[in-house]
Amino acid sequence: MTAILAKNEASSLWARFCEWITSTENRLYIGWFGVIMIPTLLTATSVFIIAFIAAPPVDIDGIREPVSGSLLYGNNIISGAVVPTSNAIGLHFYPIWEAASLDEWLYNGGPYQLIVCHFFLGICCYMGREWELSYRLGMRPWIAVAYSAPVAAATAVFIIYPIGQGSFSDGMPLGISGTFNFMIVFQAEHNILMHPFHMLGVAGVFGGSLFSAMHGSLVTSSLIRETTENESANEGYKFGQEEETYNIVAAHGYFGRLIFQYASFNNSRSLHFFLAAWPVVGIWFTALGISTMAFNLNGFNFNQSVVDSQGRVLNTWADIINRANLGMEVMHERNAHNFPLDLASVEAPSVNA
């Protein structure tokens, strides 16, 4: 009898725990994805803060020339970063217990891999948690679908690109100037500005900003007056009210006359779907572009200059881009190799002639 009561009590405790985890009445929804998300994101955030402040220099290129990234080693908020794991480690899984000592782990940039792996798990679980909460509330799943765009982008620069290039040292540094350095080197090595998927991503981001500003300004300009001149227009809206707070017909008429009739949406649902889908699809394409360039399927190149009938080069914008790319590549890892790969791969002339 005692065993049965103990079993029922344990079962009841587990049932209460499950109910609490999946309850939509909590101030913050946890969910089963949250059980993984919370510790992974807390770990990534804690290690990032500690490493950004106090991590020792990292031998990023694997040539015994450490690069400092933390505040205590001479950097500021702009120049500071968590430096990627050493090229000497490559793609090997490098937890603390794989290193001979903590000093070796820090010297080889172990914190970067720890942060990136936990961050990746955390944001994936955050996306799953969005879907889980939507499911339990009876909502459609598009919030998680929209969030998949930044998840795909982060996965591309932190996971797929290092895999394609053969080393976590090629991942994006975790800092402001490190991000810009990553972008410049990416352009030098892959000519990303001439990749169609990057162009679609630019159209998605800037187009999304434009459409968001247009929508917000149209709605704000066509609010239904509910207040006096001495009150804020925001006081005219009560949370949960059934009435429309703006006149979509007026906004539609204004924009249709400003551009042309069919440039304006007359359906609020299709309008908001478009506002969500445009930047999401653009960022999906950018992430796909990064993922293909990770394996050196690069942007268009025009390495063969345009020449006239006499063989003289006719300088074009492509020549300027090529020179800029070579210049950026020369500055990158200047102590690891003497020339950019484009120049080093040229066959040397014979000296026996």
Curated annotation (Swiss-Prot):
Binding of [CaMn4O5] cluster, residues: 170, 189, 332-333, 342, 344
Cellular component GO terms held in the UniProt record: chloroplast thylakoid membrane; photosystem II
Gene name tied to this protein: psbA
Gene Ontology terms, MF aspect: chlorophyll binding; electron transporter, transferring electrons within the cyclic electron transport pathway of photosynthesis activity; iron ion binding; oxidoreductase activity, acting on diphenols and related substances as donors, oxygen as acceptor; oxygen evolving activity
Cofactor binding comment, as recorded: The D1/D2 heterodimer binds P680, chlorophylls that are the primary electron donor of PSII, and subsequent electron acceptors. It shares a non-heme iron and each subunit binds pheophytin, quinone, additional chlorophylls, carotenoids and lipids. D1 provides most of the ligands for the Mn4-Ca-O5 cluster of the oxygen-evolving complex (OEC). There is also a Cl(-1) ion associated with D1 and D2, which is required for oxygen evolution. The PSII complex binds additional chlorophylls, carotenoids and specific lipids.
PTM statement from Swiss-Prot or TrEMBL: The 9 C-terminal residues are removed, probably by CTPA (AC O04073); processing is essential to allow assembly of the oxygen-evolving complex and thus photosynthetic growth. Tyr-161 forms a radical intermediate that is referred to as redox-active TyrZ, YZ or Y-Z.
Main localization, broad class: plastid
Full protein name: Photosystem II protein D1
Membrane topology: Multi-pass membrane protein
Site entry: Stabilizes free radical intermediate: 190
Transmembrane stretches, start-end: 29-46, 118-133, 142-156, 197-218, 274-288
Residues that coordinate or bind pheophytin a: 126
Annotated site, Tyrosine radical intermediate, chain positions: 161
Any one of the GO BP annotations: response to herbicide
Residue list for modification Phosphothreonine: 2
UniProt-annotated binding residues for chlorophyll a ChlzD1: 118
